[in-house]
Curated annotation (Swiss-Prot):
The protein, known as: Structural maintenance of chromosomes protein 6
Region span, Flexible hinge: 530-695
Cell compartment(s), UniProt: Nucleus; Chromosome
UniProt cross-references to PANTHER family, sorted A to Z: STRUCTURAL MAINTENANCE OF CHROMOSOMES 5,6 SMC5, SMC6, STRUCTURAL MAINTENANCE OF CHROMOSOMES PROTEIN 6
Keywords on record: ATP-binding, Chromosome, Coiled coil, DNA damage, DNA recombination, DNA repair, Nucleotide-binding, Nucleus
Binding site for ATP: G109, N110, N111, G112, S113, G114, K115, S116
Entry annotated with the keyword Coiled coil: yes
Organism: Saccharomyces cerevisiae (strain ATCC 204508 / S288c) (Baker's yeast)
Cited SUPFAM superfamilies: P-loop containing nucleoside triphosphate hydrolases
Coiled-coil intervals, chain numbering: 259-529, 696-969
InterPro entries: P-loop_NTPase, Rad50/SbcC_AAA
Subunit organization: Component of the Smc5-Smc6 complex which consists of KRE29, MMS21, NSE1, NSE3, NSE4, NSE5, SMC5 and SMC6.
Motif (Nuclear localization signal): 35-39
Length: 1114
């Protein structure tokens, strides 16, 4: 048949092939459906709801099931659900395993715990592309940072009814997918015992299709973005589109339209087929008339044979050169194998050397531990000696104070005795007089009053001592704070002086050796595949007008400002070596990243507030995109007032993760989620440029010095107020104490006077005793003073003894610290060697794999060389069949294939011309006749087959279109009924209205407070969220997918609606045996809703490690 094409249309052959293929597919499907109806008599995914398997007969009727205990009955789930998920080095998971239930599963955990990574792993493991997960454009982006590969293992149940090839796979089907950084991803389909059945993706797709798991259906596996898009669809057209895609109605419509287009195109081409058939018939009739023989001239045939031989010998020469090139390629690959082998040998030698050195270091550590213990023992002994000397010193001091107190008391007694003696001497000349009984009563009253005064005096003494202690504590606190602020001010003044002298201190803000590090990188830049870039803070500048946000922005992205960027792991290792050689002590992050420029405008924060991107200038666009990747700066907004920022975040603005607010020059606020507020302290050193680095933070340092000076004065004033208050209290207590002592003195004097008058006799005995007592007191004072001088000498002696002990204490402490530092250094050294050994082992495995690939390539090329040589020999034999190579060289023939082809065409035309002039032989006429007849009969048969196939296709399309309309009505009806049932949970009513003309889906809700149903867009936030959740469940109802998943369905719900929504999900999905449902949420489901069902499984993820430095509520 002659190939005919029409401008603007597909070739007829392609249309015919598609038509026949479609017809054959239809017939196969009908035959399969007939076989299925004969074998099972059930519909896909719902086939086991009406009947239950019986152990003996294979089925048990529904009436038998009805007799079972309805309280304990739980419908058995069919095969195909995911039993276990195992992840290795996938996204944030290093080694993770999770067992899932056959029905409803909740995966709960805090943000950052890796919940969404589980859903991503399931979709990727079942054959989805990376772009379908909204987690990256390439599968390699999903490999855990620092790792060469990631592995996803899914265990599918195959033990129940509806199993897939159970005789081959057993009770489990294991799907394994491996992602590599330096190679393509691979699949593996294994049986229950781990035996690999297939490694082809199409076989895994066959299993997935068998269990009816539409991985590519966006409504089957709703990621965070997909769930957000569906649950917040703003227009009725969006809702209609989501519903039609999820229930596959849209795909069916597109397939029917495509089949109709094929049918119409085939009908148009039938006329061309008929014309071709007529042309074949004419050729067939002409062939009958040919009777003459054709003779060919011998010269033309000879020339044609030589040309064909020359063409074959040229091919032999070309293939011989190609064989030599392949052999040269083998030599090159073998050289690479030798290089990789040398690298493996070097790594193994390093591993042996580090292992040997590690044993030596461990021995040094053991010796150093003993040495540290000895130094610690010496230090403890010195401490004990110092403590004993201090105890003696304090004891002698106490004795000295006691002696001084006794001296003061003795002198007071001497003064009192002098007065008494003077009074007695005066009384000797007087007569004793007065009422002694009255004086005794007055004496008793004075003794009681004196006792009360003594108690008051003791209380005031204690209070006075307490207030003095408080005054001393306040003074100590004041000195400590003043000393800290003064030291900070002095440091900043020194930094300002360095800047004024022209010393560039900007790089020292990252590390004191940063300038040395940059010089070393510049000197060794040829060793890098791509020179390292950093620190990133030196490539960023605060725009004019945003200077007040400098510290707040630096605090928000501080982890990225210190970082350096390298392009591959090799440069990463080289950069770490350079850092160690330059003595970098700061924590410098190293980011392995290939700089690129991309459009992130769709991810920018929505609102009238500026973002960090608006406040920064970057040295080049690639650096800007790097900060977007590292710190999400396009989603951090700048709002001065924290209350305004909180109100803005509570409105859930699009693409906003955090807001920064100002507080003072030393601290600020970071807000996220509308409810969380962290108070952060700014760093003193500036690690990004301000106004093109014109001042390098000079003005900020001056402002900070001025502020700290004011703060210093404020501290002085504050403590002065405290001290004034304490001293006022001290003065008051001291005045009361003096008054009390005066009262006691007067009382004692009067009591002494009364006692003397009561016991007075006219004699000199009392006077003499007082004189003797005064003499004894004076002698005691003299002895106390001598003891005091002796104690002073002892104290000086103890102080002299303490000096060498203090020096010994300091020296032992210093030796202990040095020994501990050396021990720590040895431990860090051995840890570093262990990490290097592990790295070299990983490198060895990597190079072994690389060597294996090289060797396999050599084997493949050797096979190709052998095949090529064998082909060359066959070509030589074919060429020799025409003529020898020597004969070709002696004949004047063209040297290129193009020239040979042109001359062959010319010779062939001359032969054809001769044939036309001379006619054909009888055999040739017969051959031509047979050929034309066969072509005509074949064309006629194919025309009839196509015509019949078109008729069958037309009838099938009409039947399929009618079935689609019925299915569409049934699907919409099921969704509407399920939606209505979900609304009853909150005592609402309503319906789904599908409008085909405008392709829109309207949702009408009648709440308990409404008289008339309203559109869902007019509802409150909670009611709207509940309605959207009911719509999602209604969409799932007719989907009949074996597995469905939803990520963070409650992200826009408050606590009340979250509880209602969760209760609705549990009620609707917990008893559905044909579908395994996976719900991911950051909320604790156990606290939100009461869940007590064997059909519900809750899996709690481990919380991520993070710190909260907020002091907002302190």
């Amino acid at each position: 048949m002659i190939s005919t094409t029409i401008s603007g249309k597909r070739p007829i052959e392609q249309v015919d092939d598609e038509l026949l293929s479609l017809t054959a597919q239809q017939e196969n499907e009908e035959q399969q459906q007939q076989r299925k109806r004969r074998r099972h008599q059930f519909a896909p995914m719902t086939q086991f709801n009406s009947n239950t398997l019986d152990e003996d007969s294979g089925f048990r009727s529904s009436s038998d099931v009805a007799t079972a205990d309805q309280d304990n009955f739980l419908e058995e789930s069919p095969s195909g659900y995911i039993k276990k998920v195992i992840l290795r080095n996938f996204m944030c998971h290093e080694h993770f395993e999770l067992e899932l239930g056959s029905r409803l599963n909740f995966i709960v955990g805090n943000n950052g715990s890796g919940k969404s990574a589980i859903l991503t792993a399931i979709t990727i493991g079942l054959g989805a592309k990376a772009s379908e997960t909204n987690r990256g454009s390439s599968l390699k982006d999903l490999i855990r940072e620092g790792c060469y590969s990631a592995k996803i293992i899914l265990h599918l149940d195959n033990s129940k009814y509806g199993a897939y090839q159970q005789g081959i796979f057993g009770n489990e089907i294991i799907v394994e997918r491996i992602i590599k950084r330096d190679g393509p991803a691979s699949f593996s389909l294994r049986s229950e015992n781990g035996k690999e059945i297939s490694n082809k993706k199409k076989d895994i797709q066959t299993v997935v299709d068998y269990f009816s798991v539409p991985v590519s259906n966006p409504m089957c596996f709703l990621s965070q973005d997909a769930a957000r898009s569906f649950l917040t669809a703003s227009t009725s057209q969006d809702k209609y589109s989501h519903f039609m895609k999820g229930t596959l109605l849209q795909e069916i419509t597109e397939n029917l339209l495509y089949a109709s287009a094929i049918h119409d195109s085939a009908q148009e081409n039938m006329a061309l087929h008929l014309e071709n058939l007529k042309s074949l018939k004419a050729e067939y009739e002409d062939a009958k008339k040919l009777l003459r023989e054709l003779n060919q001239t011998s010269d033309l045939n000879e020339r044609k044979m030589l040309l064909q031989a020359k063409s074959l010998w040229i091919d032999v020469a070309h293939n011989t050169d190609a064989c030599k090139n392949l052999e040269n390629e083998i030599s090159g690959i073998q050289q690479k194998v030798d290089e990789v082998t040398e690298k493996i040998r070097n790594r193994q030698e390093k591993i042996e050397r580090y292992t040997s050195d590690g044993t030596t270091i461990e021995a040094q550590i053991d010796a150093k531990v003993i040495y540290v213990n000895e130094k610690d023992s010496e230090h403890q002994n010195a401490r004990e000696l110092l403590r004993d000397v201090k105890s003696r010193f304090e004891k002698e001091k106490s004795n000295q104070a006691e002696a001084q107190s006794n001296i003061d008391q003795g002198r007071k007694k001497v003064d009192a005795l002098n007065k008494t003696i003077a009074h007695l001497e005066e009384e000797l000349t007087k007569e004793m007089g007065g009422d002694k009984d009255q004086m005794r009563q007055e004496l008793e009253q004075l003794e009681k009053a004196n006792e009360k005064l003594r108690e008051v005096n003791n209380s005031l003494v204690v209070s006075l001592q307490d207030v003095k202690n408080e005054e001393r504590d306040i003074q100590h606190e004041r000195e400590s704070e003043l000393r800290t602020i003064s030291r900070s001010i002095q440091n900043k003044k020194v930094e300002l002086q360095n800047i004024a002298k022209g010393n560039d201190t900007f790089l020292m803000n990252f590390d004191r050796n940063m300038d040395r590090l940059l010089r070393t990188i510049e000197q060794r830049k040829n060793e890098f595949e791509t020179p390292a870039i950093g620190p990133l803070g030196s490539l960023v500048t605060i725009r004019k007008g945003f200077e007040k946000w400098t510290r707040s922005i630096q605090r928000a992205i501080s982890s990225s400002l210190n970082a350096f960027v390298v392009s591959n792991p090799k440069d990463n290792r080289l950069f770490r070596d350079i850092m160690r050689s330059c003595g970098i002590r700061s924590n410098i992050p190293i980011v392995t990243y290939c700089l690129s420029q991309f459009d992130y405008s769709k991810g920018r924060a929505h609102g009238n507030y500026p973002t960090i991107v608006d406040a920064l200038e970057f040295s080049k666009p690639e650096i800007e995109c790097l900060f977007v990747d590292l710190s999400r700066i396009e989603r951090i907004v700048l709002i001065e007032d924290k209350n305004e920022a909180r109100n803005f975040l509570q409105r859930n603005p699009v693409n906003v993760n955090m807001a920064l607010s100002l507080r003072d020059r030393r601290s600020g606020f970071q807000l996220s989620g509308g409810y969380r507020l962290d108070t952060v302290t700014y760093q003193d050193k500036i690690r990004l440029k301000v106004n093109s680095s014109s001042d390098n933070g000079t003005q900020y340092l001056k402002d900070l010095i001025e502020q700290e000076t004011k703060e210093l004065q404020n501290i002085r004033d504050r403590y002065e107020e405290k001290l004034s208050e304490v001293r006022s209290r001290l003065k008051e207590i001291d005045g009361r104490l003096k008054s009390t002592k005066n009262e006691m003195r007067k009382t004692n004097f009067r009591m002494t006077e009364l006692k003397m008058n009561v016991g007075k006799v006219v004699d000199t005995g009392i006077l003499n005793s007082k004189i003797n007592e005064r003499k004894n007191q004076e002698q005691a004072i003299a002895s106390y003073e001598a003891a005091k001088e002796e104690l002073g000498l002892k104290i000086e002696q103890i102080a002299q003894e303490a000096q060498p002990i203090k020096e010994q204490y300091d020296s032992t402490k210093l030796a202990l610290v040095e020994a501990q530092d050396e021990l720590q250094q040895l431990k860090e050294d051995i840890n570093s060697r262990q990490s290097k050994i592990q790295k070299y082992k990983d490198d060895t495995i990597y190079y072994e794999d690389k060597k294996k690939v090289y060797l396999e390539n050599i084997k493949k090329i050797e096979v190709n060389v052998a095949a090529l040589k064998e082909g060359i020999q066959r070509q030589i034999q074919n060429a020799c069949a025409f003529c020898s190579k020597e004969r070709i060289e002696n004949v004047d023939l063209p040297d290129t294939q193009e020239e040979i082809k042109r001359e062959l065409d010319k010779v062939s035309r001359m032969i054809q011309k001769a044939e036309k002039s001379l006619g054909l032989s009888q055999e040739e006429v017969i051959a031509l006749f047979e050929k034309c007849r066969n072509k005509y009969k074949e064309g006629q048969k194919k025309y009839m087959e196509i015509d019949e196939a078109l008729n069958r296709l037309h009838n099938s399309l009409k039947a399929r279109d009618q079935n689609y309309k019925n299915a569409e009505k049934g699907t919409c009806f099921d969704a509407d009924m399920d939606f209505r049932a979900s609304l009853k949970v909150r005592k609402f009513s309503g319906n789904l209205s599908f409008i085909k003309d405008t392709k829109s889906l309207e949702i009408y809700i009648l709440t308990t407070n409404d008289e008339k149903a309203r559109n869902v867009d007019t509802l409150s936030g909670g009611e709207k969220s509940f309605s959207q959740m009911a719509l999602l469940l209604a969409t799932w109802k007719p989907m009949r997918s074996r597995i469905i998943a939803l990520d963070e369905f409650d992200v826009f719900m408050d606590q009340v609606n979250r509880k209602i929504g969760t209760t609705l999900i549990v009620k609707k999905l917990k008893d559905i045996a044909r579908t395994q449902t996976i719900i991911i949420t950051p909320q604790d489901i156990g606290k939100i809703a009461d869940i007590d069902s064997s059909g519900v499984s809750i899996h709690r993820m481990r919380d991520p490690e993070r710190q909260n430095n907020s002091n907002f509520y302190n």
